[in-house]
Amino acid sequence: MTDTGTGAGPGTAAPGPASAALRAKLALAEPVLHRATARLWRPGAGLTARYTRYLGAMYHVIRASVPLMELAALRCAALAADPVAAPLARYLHHHIDEERGHDDWLLADAAAAGADPGGIAGDTPPAAVARLVGAQYYWIEYHHPVTLLGYIAVLEGNAPAPWLAGRLARETGLPDAAFGTVRRHADLDGGHRDDLDRLLDRLPLTVRQRTAVAVSALHTVDAVAELFRQLAAAGARPAPAAIH
């Protein structure tokens, strides 16, 4: 295993508030994600099927959350000389407890929506999910566990709108029980993002570490947007051919 984290590059902390810098970068990139999200939740024919596909894909994303954080915490333990490692590990251990079981919420929602939870859990995850999650495994293992903070910043900084669960319930006719995860994350994720901002501003991040967090975050925006575009397009009818 190659450690190219704190051993490579300047050892002084980067100037300026890290959380504000990351938010500024994401503000430039996130319109792409917002457009993909709007496309996914567009009203009309196919919304129920799109929502069910979303539950399945997000199950495969979210079930990786705790293992990713556990791996990152383990890597922190191997970086005892790195001043970022110990506070990062404390944050991860706390966050692991908060995130555990969220994949089960998605399976419960899928069952309420009439889908087969066992089938979802046994499905091969889409390649777009592997692209989203797999990059984090690589960066944690072969670069530095702090990169995971960019991933977390995007997932928790783009929580469902508080009104989304109600709108989807009305337009799909599915029971309220099918929207538990959307509703809970609308309530929880804003506070989690604030916690992450405080951590980013406390950590003595080097310039290269701040860059790594930003690269991870921007990749996550792109990968989630691509996943949502695929979910929105799956099963869509092709446009009718023009008549000449």
Give residue ranges: language-model regions:
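Non-heme di-metal
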Residues: 2-3, 9-244
